[in-house]
């Protein structure tokens, strides 16, 4: 569960990435959350990273990536809205920390149907991505632009990146990615795996986020990028 400040910071970073493609500076985050020092921002970012909501990209300035969003509104928002007079459902709008009550005759919020394309290995590779099994209806702000699909994670090779066995990962379709991105890789047109991309000269390395698994290195003609991780859903 996130605190209100943690939730507000996560939403602020997410909205800024959607608008500009660049994370906000520490000064901008400090001002947005009305904090007196940057040390408070550092603590909030560390807490979000430990909980698997964001990750810091190595060797890049202002490099933050939102891995997933919480399943529900910030703690205390609904109670504050209802003034203690019973339950009053609330939804999050696009701007930071703003909520509005659900009206009975209001049209339902727009959703995007994302196909679940089977299972993906976060461990030893499995056979190539299976055919569509069902769909997830997700809010557009969770996805951003582009075409997306979802996969169920099997294995524990990405646990240090906050990705656990049984999670559902949201993937934006693409055939290129930056080094350091977590990707869906198709190896030899047979094996599908979820790993972090590293480039070593002309070769491609698929790196696990678990020391129990070795990095696998391939020639560039053996690996095809199917998409890049943009979000994660976890059920408790």
Swiss-Prot record:
Residues 26-46 bind DNA. One of its GO terms (molecular function) is DNA binding. GO terms for biological process: DNA repair; DNA replication; negative regulation of DNA-templated transcription; proteolysis; SOS response. It catalyses: Hydrolysis of Ala-|-Gly bond in repressor LexA. InterPro entries: LexA, LexA-like, LexA/Signal_pep-like_sf, LexA_DNA-bd_dom, LexA_repressor, Peptidase_S24_LexA, Peptidase_S24_S26A/B/C, WH-like_DNA-bd_sf. The record marks 122-123 as: Cleavage. CDD domains: S24_LexA-like. NCBIfam families: lexA (TIGR00498). Homodimer. PANTHER family: LEXA REPRESSOR, LEXA REPRESSOR-RELATED. This is LexA repressor.
């Amino acid at each position: 569960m996130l605190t209100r400040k943690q939730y507000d910071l996560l939403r602020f970073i997410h909205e800024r990435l959607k608008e500009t493609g660049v994370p906000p500076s520490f000064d901008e985050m400090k001002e947005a959350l009305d904090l007196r020092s940057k040390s408070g921002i550092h603590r909030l970012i560390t807490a979000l990273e430990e909980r698997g909501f964001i990750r810091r990209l190595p060797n890049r300035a202002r490099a933050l990536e939102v891995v997933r969003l919480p399943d529900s509104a910030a703690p205390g928002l609904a109670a504050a809205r209802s003034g203690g007079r019973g339950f009053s459902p609330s939804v999050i709008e696009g701007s930071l920390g703003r909520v509005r009550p659900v009206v009975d005759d209001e049209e339902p919020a727009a959703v995007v149907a994302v196909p679940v394309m089977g299972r993906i290995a976060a461990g030893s590779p499995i056979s190539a991505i299976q055919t569509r099994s069902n769909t997830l209806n997700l809010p557009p702000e969770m996805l951003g632009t582009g075409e997306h699909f979802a996969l169920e994670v099997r294995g524990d090779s990405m646990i240090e990146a906050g990705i656990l066995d049984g999670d559902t990962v949201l993937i934006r379709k693409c055939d290129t990615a930056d080094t350091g991105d977590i990707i869906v890789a198709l190896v030899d047109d047979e094996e599908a795996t979820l790993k972090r991309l590293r480039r070593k000269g002309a070769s491609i390395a698929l790196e696990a986020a678990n020391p129990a698994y070795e990095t696998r290195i391939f020639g560039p003609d053996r690996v095809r990028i199917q998409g890049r991780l943009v979000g994660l859903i976890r059920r408790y």
